[in-house]
């Protein structure tokens, strides 16, 4: 045993323990203060839970947003390892066994069970990457039959997008990990045997999330986990100062409640290292619940409950039929054999199942002894191969059967599956725990028997005669098949809980829309199997990842929409076509976002002039003294003193002002309508202050036609200039940086020609 380390007042860049430097944790994670108290703009997305799906969706929001969105990822646990534990040497990290009651201390270092139930569960891995560091890797698609109870739009989406996720996770190509003589022989024999088992529909290549061969020039990532993609994204973002950094991961941050006002989440309550904290969020900020099916649903029930939440709870019926058959029944095989794996799909009127088949010529009951691991020592590899049984092949048929959810479940009915907040049990933070009632109905039990019988029938058909097969149960080999129910796992052991926040088009009969957004919460989303309307027999990972990509895309497109047809997007990562006049600068924050620094100056678009147009600009400020503006119709700059040429835009163009104080430099007073946000500076007053609170995105819609300029701010007409007072009716567009310390961000700068300008451009292009 070693002494517990206590934090002290001294600070270090990287903490040192008795055995190691915490380089991984320090380089990937941030403290709460580093993420929240850095003087930066508010977050555009907050993801709760850095487990299998939280890490994935956070990375997708960051990547798809091309740096335009500021993302915060909150994780209740700490950092453990940076990839799947089976990609490491024999390190001794294992998934925890199921328990009925959590002992109050971590099991296997990071595992805890935060809910209570009528059945045993392994619980959650409280660490970055979560259960994706331990999962089995099986990733089958949902079939057409599985999807029949899903909304048609999602059926189409999944079929069109599954392959992108398969390529990302290593499922495609399918046979780069499992191949060889044993696979070829067993696949051929299995294809034949499958035709003789009535409920079997077919045999497929094993869909395993393992990349054994990478694209040219790259190393394979081996078994997939969400941790490496998150780590890479965090390190990519780490080059920026905290005040402009786009992705933060804060561990030891346990979210206990989401506070909302009129259907808008406005604060996240959490405990950070035991201290109560509140993170304020704006209506623009997407909050994604990705803390597992049970915990995400518990958090939703605690924060903004609806009667449907917690119904439709599903998991999988799982069995493990282990046999060994005579090696001779598979024909002549080489002396040394690699492992083999394949997927067998089946169906009955009661539901669908699949069998995950693994095989190895080893002396023992573990057909996966030479799979799912790194073997760094060639002598150890020789020992493993030498342990092969030259007369037998051990095969495991892991049956996975679907459960049908009950969308009308009552939380007082013990005969059906559901979850709710417990009225009797609170967690260490004083919040109600979830209670999970998970049961197999009589129909499910009948189906479970059928699935188990199919596994035995398939094994017997492979063996040919009873003399060629033995069955493993009760820790011994037997000549008789296992009795009914003997090889089953508990209902809570699969890690496949799903359905309690299901998606749909009708708010009266579903909880989330088809993008994973809560029907009744403007900025609330969820990710993971909780979204599933129905589960099918397929492991939920591939489908949940694919849906998370859709949710991330919806969040990004809401913040950074694609320009409409006929609309020109002016901003770009290289600021191509833009030039700085005066002092100061604009910093590129994302592919479509810039932030002012210093001043006074003007970033102006040089490529072309605009006459009649509709200009849309989103902007936000962080301090009441921030000042900026959008300039229109000014002549070419740069012909005079570079430090002064911006003044030409002031003297001859038009400025739509950004200054909520309405400061008038002529009288040194505030509250001037001619100098207030939305005014055409000193030409047309703002009739009202329509800007949103500091930190929130505002939208200008500026319509210029002839001498007429109308300014709408967040949908309200705030100023109208009807007399151009001799100023140009055509010119350039620019963004102002006003003074040192003023920070204003701009994004989505879209311009569309209207009216006479469109006709003139058409005429010019036809010549």
How would you name each of these model-derived features?
Residues 84-85, 91-179, 185, 405-425:
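Redox-cofactor-proximal catalytic regions of oxidoreductases
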Residues 145-146, 151-257, 261, 466-473, ...:
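Conserved redox-cofactor binding core of oxidoreductases
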């Amino acid at each position: 045993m070693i002494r517990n380390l206590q934090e002290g007042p001294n600070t270090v860049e990287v903490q040192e323990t008795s055995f190691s430097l915490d380089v991984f944790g320090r380089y990937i994670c941030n403290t709460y203060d580093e993420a929240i108290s850095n003087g930066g703009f508010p977050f555009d997305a907050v993801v709760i839970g850095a487990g299998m799906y939280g890490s994935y969706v956070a990375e997708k929001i960051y990547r798809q947003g091309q740096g335009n969105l500021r993302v915060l990822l909150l994780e209740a646990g700490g950092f453990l390892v940076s990839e799947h534990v089976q990609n490491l040497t024999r390190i001794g990290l294992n998934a925890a066994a199921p328990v009925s009651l959590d002992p109050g201390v971590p099991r296997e270092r990071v595992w805890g069970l935060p809910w209570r139930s009528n059945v045993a569960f392994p619980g959650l891995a409280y660490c970055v990457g979560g259960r994706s560091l331990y999962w089995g890797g099986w990733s089958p698609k949902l079939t057409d039959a599985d999807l029949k109870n899903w909304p048609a739009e999602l059926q189409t989406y999944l079929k069109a997008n599954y392959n992108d996720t398969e390529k990302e996770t290593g499922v495609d190509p399918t046979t780069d990990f499992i191949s060889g003589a044993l696979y070829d022989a067993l696949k051929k024999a299995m294809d034949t045997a499958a035709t003789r088992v009535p409920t079997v529909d077919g045999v497929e290549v094993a869909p395993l999330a393992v990349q054994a061969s990478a694209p040219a020039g790259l190393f394979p990532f081996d078994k997939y986990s969400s941790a490496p993609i998150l780590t890479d994204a965090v390190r990519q973002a780490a080059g920026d100062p905290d005040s402009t950094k786009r992705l933060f991961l804060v561990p030891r941050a346990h979210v206990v409640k989401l506070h909302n006002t009129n259907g808008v989440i406005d604060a996240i309550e959490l405990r950070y290292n035991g201290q109560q904290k509140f993170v304020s969020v704006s209506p623009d900020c997407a909050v994604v619940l990705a803390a597992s099916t049970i915990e995400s649903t518990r958090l939703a029930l605690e924060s903004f409950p609806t009667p449907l939440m917690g119904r439709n709870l599903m998991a999988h019926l799982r069995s493990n039929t282990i046999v060994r058959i005579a090696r001779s029944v598979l024909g002549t095989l080489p002396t040394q054999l690699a492992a083999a794996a394949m997927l067998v799909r089946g169906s009955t009127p009661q539901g669908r199942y699949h069998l995950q088949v693994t095989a190895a010529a080893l002396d023992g009951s573990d057909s996966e002894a030479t799979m799912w691991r790194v073997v760094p020592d060639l002598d150890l590899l020789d020992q493993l191969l030498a342990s092969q049984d030259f007369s037998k092949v051990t095969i495991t048929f892991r049956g996975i059967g679907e459960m049908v959810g009950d969308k009308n479940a009552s939380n007082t009915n013990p005969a059906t599956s559901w979850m709710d907040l417990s009225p009797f049990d609170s967690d260490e933070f004083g919040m109600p725990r979830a209670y999970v009632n998970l049961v197999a109905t009589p129909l499910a039990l009948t189906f479970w028997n059928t699935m188990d019988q199919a596994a035995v029938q398939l094994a017997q058909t492979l063996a040919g005669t009873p003399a060629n097969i033995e069955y493993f149960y009760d820790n011994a080999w037997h000549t008789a098949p296992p009795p009914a129910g003997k090889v089953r796992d508990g209902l809570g052991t699969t890690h496949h809980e799903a359905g309690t926040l299901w998606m749909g088009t009708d708010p009266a009969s579903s909880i989330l829309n088809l993008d994973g957004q809560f029907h009744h919460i403007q900025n609330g989303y969820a990710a993971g199997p909780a979204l599933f309307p129905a589960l099918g027999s397929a492991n939920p990972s591939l489908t949940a990842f694919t849906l998370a990509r859709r949710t991330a895309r919806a969040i990004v497109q809401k913040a950074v929409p694609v320009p409409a047809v006929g609309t020109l997007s002016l901003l770009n990562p290289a600021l191509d076509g833009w030039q700085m006049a005066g002092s100061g600068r604009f910093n590129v924050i994302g592919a479509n976002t810039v932030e002012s620094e210093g001043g006074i100056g003007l970033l102006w678009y040089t490529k072309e002039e605009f006459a009649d147009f509709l200009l849309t600009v989103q902007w936000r400020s962080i301090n009441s003294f921030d000042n900026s503006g959008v300039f229109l119709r000014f002549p070419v700059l740069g012909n005079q003193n570079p430090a002064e040429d911006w003044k030409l835009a002031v003297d001859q163009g038009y400025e739509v002002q950004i200054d909520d104080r309405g400061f008038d430099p002529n009288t040194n007073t505030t509250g001037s309508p001619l100098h207030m946000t939305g005014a055409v500076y000193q030409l047309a007053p703002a009739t009202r202050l329509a800007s949103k609170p500091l930190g929130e995105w505002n939208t200008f819609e500026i319509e210029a036609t002839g001498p007429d300029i109308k300014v709408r701010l967040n949908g309200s007409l705030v100023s109208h200039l009807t007399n151009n007072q001799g100023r140009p009716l055509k010119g350039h567009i620019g963004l102002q940086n006003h003074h040192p310390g003023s920070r204003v961000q701009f994004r989505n700068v879209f311009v569309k020609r209207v009216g006479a300008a469109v006709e003139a451009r058409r005429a010019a292009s036809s010549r």
